[in-house]
Amino acid sequence: MRITQGTFSFLPDLTDEQIKKQIDYMISKKLAIGIEYTNDIHPRNSFWEMWGLPLFEVTDPAPVLFEINACRKAKSNFYIKVVGFSSERGIESTIISFIVNRPKHEPGFNLIRQEDKSRSIKYSIQAYETYKPEDQRY
């Protein structure tokens, strides 16, 4: 099951050249660029682990690509995304984010149904991978 999170989630995986163009766009908009990774891909898990510090006032995509590749090498079986953050007053939020690395196998989610009062049913999801210990996922 292909996970769809981020700006280009329904498109094929971005090539390194396409990633470079997106980084150029983020630089032109003066965004702080961060690299994050996780092995818990639940849709409400918005707090991924940071890879190093965010890159502020970058003028060239090379250092960002270097950090992406270092993260890919160290965390090859994790989801890795690039995040562009605007510090502009009134926005102060993530403007763009997209996945640049995925595990080879994406097992998907388990739908959990719970009966509640008055015969109502509550639904939740849990990633199949979270049944395994954190260091054994993917």
Curated annotation (Swiss-Prot):
Keywords: Calvin cycle, Carbon dioxide fixation, Chloroplast, Photorespiration, Photosynthesis, Plastid
Coiled coil: none
Entry's Gene Ontology molecular function annotations: ribulose-bisphosphate carboxylase activity
Swiss-Prot/TrEMBL GO biological process terms: reductive pentose-phosphate cycle
Domain of life of the source: Eukaryota
Pfam families from the UniProt entry: RuBisCO_small
Gene3D superfamilies: Ribulose bisphosphate carboxylase, small subunit
CDD domains named among the record's database cross-references: RuBisCO_small
Family in the record: Belongs to the RuBisCO small chain family.
Known role: RuBisCO catalyzes two reactions: the carboxylation of D-ribulose 1,5-bisphosphate, the primary event in carbon dioxide fixation, as well as the oxidative fragmentation of the pentose substrate in the photorespiration process. Both reactions occur simultaneously and in competition at the same active site. Although the small subunit is not catalytic it is essential for maximal activity. Carbon dioxide and oxygen bind in the same pocket of the enzyme in a similar manner.
PANTHER family reported for this sequence: RIBULOSE BISPHOSPHATE CARBOXYLASE SMALL CHAIN 1, CHLOROPLASTIC (PTHR31262), RIBULOSE BISPHOSPHATE CARBOXYLASE SMALL SUBUNIT (PTHR31262:SF23)
Assembly with partners or alone: Heterohexadecamer of 8 large and 8 small subunits.
Protein name: Ribulose bisphosphate carboxylase small subunit
